[in-house]
Amino acid sequence: MTRPIQASLDLQALKQNLSIVRQAATHARVWSVVKANAYGHGIERIWSAIGATDGFALLNLEEAITLRERGWKGPILMLEGFFHAQDLEIYDQHRLTTCVHSNWQLKALQNARLKAPLDIYLKVNSGMNRLGFQPDRVLTVWQQLRAMANVGEMTLMSHFAEAEHPDGISGAMARIEQAAEGLECRRSLSNSAATLWHPEAHFDWVRPGIILYGASPSGQWRDIANTGLRPVMTLSSEIIGVQTLKAGERVGYGGRYTARDEQRIGIVAAGYADGYPRHAPTGTPVLVDGVRTMTVGTVSMDMLAVDLTPCPQAGIGTPVELWGKEIKIDDVAAAAGTVGYELMCALALRVPVVTV
């Protein structure tokens, strides 16, 4: 028998989440963001469930090629563009749309020998200060690209740094408008947060990521609780040991939890080597036999401890939901001082994954 931990992926939830994105951005087309191996869910496992998308957006050539080999014939957007000039041969072969954000990429495109022009997403730095041209350079760069035989359709893109806030995109939108002055261009601006909360930024293409997988771009589940979005991933395990503590006894490495009274705890087959956050403190929510309770003590490599006071019926073999439909990944992440994105992406290879 295998160790009882597993991650299950609800593909119907994934389909529903894409449908909700379309309802939120009715006039825009959708790039479904599947970077980081579909946020830890596995591109090969999930892509066909959202095959009704208009396009896929990601980073790695290997993942783009996987989509082509699995039969996806629609658009693929490479969000960070090509990393080396020689990559353009592969972009040409697989008909990939590339982001352009740096001067050297302009030169590489100019000098490349392509069989057909590539579609381009010109990135403007609207305040995130990661990638992209400054707004006052965009018109010049646009004209340079437009004059190249290797360039096909062009779209202006940017990425919001604070779209989870009600007034969080106003400054960025002003910079984008400055960049787009004098251009008649398609635009792709909205990440997950802007897709949900800033319809004025939808334009031609939205780029939802985390919301497709049923977690909140703000890191707070309550912000999306009424949207109909559903968690796709459930991480579950079982109790493999039970201890009855006396008052004053401590639990785990460093003895960071001390029982105030006699207390039963369950030892769960899950730890930080599985992707559960090591920094999750005592009190992190967990579901035992359908009853909400909490972790106690320090998370170990392969195990963690939970309070069985609310569920005295629990024992060896009792099911445990670490995150999923009832215990939201955002809540676990918040307790651990991180975000749901990180927990999804950190799911360890040793954890078996099933689709339902």
Swiss-Prot record:
List its EC numbers. 5.1.1.1
Pfam annotation, one family: Ala_racemase_N
UniProt cross-references to PROSITE patterns, sorted A to Z: ALANINE_RACEMASE (PS00395)
Summarize where substrate binds, as residue positions. 130, 301
Q: Does the keyword Isomerase apply?
A: yes
Q: Report the SMART domains cross-referenced here.
A: Ala_racemase_C (SM01005)
Catalytic center residues: 35, 253
Which reaction is this enzyme known to catalyze?
L-alanine = D-alanine
Q: Which cofactor does it need?
A: pyridoxal 5'-phosphate
**Top-rank lineage group of the source organism:** Bacteria
Quote one Gene Ontology molecular function term: protein homodimerization activity
Q: Name one GO cellular component term.
A: cytosol
Induction (record text)? By alanine.
The UniProt function text for this chain reads:
Isomerizes L-alanine to D-alanine which is then oxidized to pyruvate by DadA.
The record's listing under PANTHER family reads:
ALANINE RACEMASE, ALANINE RACEMASE, CATABOLIC-RELATED
State the protein's name.
Answer: Alanine racemase, catabolic
What organism does the record attribute this protein to? Escherichia coli (strain K12)
